[in-house]
Amino acid sequence: MQFPPSEPSELASLAVEPLVTRDFETRPATVYARLRARYGPVAPVDLHGVPVWLVLGFGEVREVLRDESVWKKDVQHWRWLREGRVPADWPHLPGYQVSHLLLQDDQRHKASRDAVEEALAPFQDADAPQSWELANAVSRHADELIAFFADGGDSGWADLGAQFARALPLMAVNRLFGFPVEQGDDVFMDSWRMVDGGPDAAAAVGRLVAATTELAAYKRQNPGDDLTTRLLAVEPPLTVEQIGLELYAIIVIMSELVSHAITNSVLEVLAGEAGTRDGLMAGPVEELVNRVHIASPPWVNLTFRFPAADTDLGDFRLAAGDAVVPSIAAAHGDPMFATPGSQEASVSSRAHLAWGAGPHQCPGRGLADMIVTTAVGRLFERCDLELGLPVDQLPWRSSTHVRGLKSFPVRYRMRTRQVPVAAPAEAAAPGPAPEPV
């Protein structure tokens, strides 16, 4: 057994390889496996010129996510940033300069999370009218989008990304937030720009926060039965600016996790052999989506954690304030969890980390899963689908954090008689956490 060194390893002195490469875009599992073979459950990597620790092991990722007394999220803990060693134009920096519940610690985080959970509760409660009204609206919007890309024809080509998987969560956001004027696709594209990093990231963050803050101010004068109004009503009260930041965080989750969970679920079916397809579609849609949460989670690498003190993790001793990236995708591929793609790993398993774990587990996971299962269910009930490109030619985003397609071309044929797929749950109750905490 190898023991961590007594002194912390200095990231700057380690020879680290870039994480985001062509291999990572097309075959991320092989990159994680190579890093695991070389370093064990924790590996030093270069993230656009800044060295960070990538956590690969299932047990180690779960430990980091669960223990907020050791692992902090507020960027003020980042030693390299405090010391001025992070370039001002580092592509991911804009996303860390906005304070919301995803990037807060301790009591400040608890206050934000309590407010968001209270406001979200009726939209995730199976007995509340708001939940089934939203679920019915999502189903109706899914049918509208299918009718729109089919345009009255029996068959044709569609981009399921732009014409369905991005559009449906956006329609849900418009309804959930109570936007007086429906937001367009540019809202989700700004989320992409922020998450993927680059020269437009800071401006994208500014536009998103401005839109949600303006909405909060509008709803203060024009309340409705929506999430924004409910956030304005929580006690102790939040400022309009705070509400704008929390709504911004929810938009990011909806655009990144929900839209790509839809396309990844459809791809899981279409890329399989005929027997695999039949097996996947024979069970409830929830089982298919749960399988995809394990085999192809949309949010592959989470936002930074920072050890509050020098800490042993894997085969290294990490220095206080080092940047640490918990990798959901790598954890799900850990041989200690299960063999990637195996039946044991993916069917009927609830022990996944796709929605996180611990104090920062996604508070809207029930709502998100409702949208995904409804979307996938309606697609397969109404259409026969085939891939428009070979699997190895599908265009993946170049992103540290997200595994999703830039576009998803398919050939569809409308069904003359709908073939029922096991229906998703009527409402979006969060239920038990996928990963017990």
Q: Locations of the language-model features?
A:
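Active-site substrate-recognition loop segments, prototypically the cytochrome P450 B′-helix/B-C loop
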Residues: 1-161, 170-182, 192-194, 356, ...
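C-terminal domain-closing interface element
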Residues: 216-224, 303-328, 406-437
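Cytochrome P450 heme-binding "Cys pocket" and the immediately downstream C-terminal segment
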Residues: 367-398
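Conserved cytochrome P450 K-helix/beta-meander segment immediately N-terminal to the heme-binding cysteine loop
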Residues: 327-351, 355
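Cytochrome P450
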Residues: 174-182, 232-236, 266-280, 297, ...
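Cytochrome P450 catalytic core segment centered on helix I
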Residues: 138, 177, 186-240
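Conserved cytochrome P450 K-helix E-x-x-R motif and the immediately C-terminal K′/meander segment
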Residues: 280-315
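Central I-helix of cytochrome P450 enzymes
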Residues: 166, 170, 232-281, 288-289, ...
